[in-house]
Amino acid sequence: MAANIAAAAAAAQEVDPVLKKAIKLLHSSNPTSAAELRLLLDEALKARFGPEKSLTNNMTPRMLEDEANFSGRAATPPQQPINADEIINLTNSPDKEPSDSVDTIADSDDGLSAVGIVNTGDTGDFGDLNCCVCGEMVFTATNRLIECSKCGAMYHQECHKPPITKEEAADDQEQNWQCDTCCNKPTSSGRTTSSAAAVTPTVFIADEPMPLTSKAKSSVASSRSSNSSNSSSPFYRPEPSSSTNASSSSSSKHGHKSSSSSSSKSHKEERSSKSTAASSLSAIGGMEKHNSSGTSSRRSGSSTKSSSKSSSSKHHESGSSSKRRSKQ
């Protein structure tokens, strides 16, 4: 401990005396302390940099004038006199009616003490900042004013139905909160889609063409409608149905007969063509057989001739041999 005290004393002795004097003048309340501090600084600058770097040469006349008029630093600040007219006795003062131009803002941790009174002068400028239920701007820590993120209306936590919870009034969830009116309001897009679905009829477009039966039915229906329209006209004369039926039956019979006769003729022609083809094939076969028999008879005739020739030659040879024998 004694060593620490000795070290502190040695450090105090090593401090520059000029710095000690400057610190004393800086905290002094003497009016001439500013001039003395400037002179001390001038001496230090001259000792280090020469007379050209004097602070007095660089000071403006206004700075010199302010230094001459310096009154010094007072040890204790003077107390301002209190006028007796500004003291108001709140205990005996009559109750004042609240004016519309005064808005009270109470914001504290316990929610009981008021921070201050703001005199707006005109409530129209701050009409959007009031609660849309009670119409007041006063709020506390437990009954804050929350703005709806959709419609922009302001609600007290207790004025809104249902009351706004602390989780909904938190700083991170306050920007996403919506009032009950906006939450229960149906969206316009849902209405438009439902109305469009109710008004727009459903139309089915077939990918494939309609069959012929439907076309025939439609043509029959159109013919019936045309007949009914013609019969309703005053100049329409109905035709006898029996004659039309008879003509249609006769035409159908005639068509059937003609078709049957044509089919029988075609069958006969086919049969005759088949018979002619068969006869031609048989004739061709007979000719081939006749040719083959002629060639065979020719071959047999030539063979008989050759055999007769050979026999005659043999007989001639035998005759000549017998003659030779008789001559001998």
Swiss-Prot record:
Q: Where in the cell is it found?
A: Nucleus
Its main localization is nucleus
UniProt-annotated stretches for the region Sufficient for binding to IntS1 and IntS9 and for 3'-end snRNA processing: 1-45
InterPro entries assigned: Int12_PHD, Integrator_subunit_12, Zinc_finger_PHD-type_CS, Znf_FYVE_PHD, Znf_PHD, Znf_PHD-finger, Znf_RING/FYVE/PHD
Residue ranges annotated as compositionally biased, kind Low complexity, are 215-233, 241-264, 274-283, 292-311
* Residue ranges covered by zinc fingers (PHD-type): 128-185
What single Pfam family name could you report for this chain, choosing any that match?
PHD
The residues that cross the membrane are none
Q: Does the keyword Metal-binding apply?
A: yes
Report one GO cellular component: INTAC complex
Q: According to its record, what is known about the domains?
A: The PHD-type zinc finger is not required for 3'-end snRNA processing.
**What is the official name of this protein in its record?**
Integrator complex subunit 12
Source taxonomy lineage?
Eukaryota, Metazoa, Ecdysozoa, Arthropoda, Hexapoda
